[in-house]
């Protein structure tokens, strides 16, 4: 069963270019170690009225973009294997120590894929 790691985070718009540079590097590392997909999406159509909008869920402040990201794996076991390799990759240690966003406001979780259409 396919598995997804999902992320939702607010990123200051002035730091968005730095975040995306970091994400491109991270995406290459994850893909090289076996992730099937690595996606970083910046909010565009987020002014919704009928449901809880992502900016409110992410507690985005004025001047922040909302980023929705996911990484797709073959299975939970494959995800565990890939992430273990990624964490040992020396390129990850070269990433900036200071993140271009507030880590305390990032949401994360692992999900079993139930429907693929």
Question: What is each stretch, according to the model?
Answer:
Residues 1-25:
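Long, hydrophobic N-terminal alpha-helical segment
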Residues 4-11, 50-86:
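Short, well-ordered beta-strand segments in beta-rich or mixed alpha/beta enzyme
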Residues 13-15, 77, 114:
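Residues that cap or initiate secondary-structure elements
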Residues 18-31, 66-71:
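Generic detector of contiguous secondary-structure segments
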Residues 20-26, 82-90:
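Short amphipathic alpha-helices in soluble, non-transmembrane regions
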Residues 31, 35-62, 88-117:
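Glycine-rich beta-strand-turn "strand-cap" elements at beta-sheet edges
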């Amino acid at each position: 069963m396919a598995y997804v790691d999902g992320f939702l985070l607010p990123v200051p718009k002035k730091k968005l270019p730095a975040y995306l540079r970091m994400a491109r590097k991270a995406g290459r590392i994850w893909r090289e170690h076996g992730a099937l997909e690595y996606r970083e999406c910046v909010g565009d159509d987020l002014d919704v009225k009928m449901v809880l909008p992502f900016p409110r869920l992410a507690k985005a402040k004025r001047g922040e973009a909302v980023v929705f990201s996911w990484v797709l794996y073959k299975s939970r076991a494959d995800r565990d294997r890939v992430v273990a390799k990624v964490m040992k990759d020396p390129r990850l240690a070269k990433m900036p120590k200071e993140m271009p966003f507030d880590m305390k406001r990032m949401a994360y979780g692992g999900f079993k894929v139930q429907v693929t259409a």
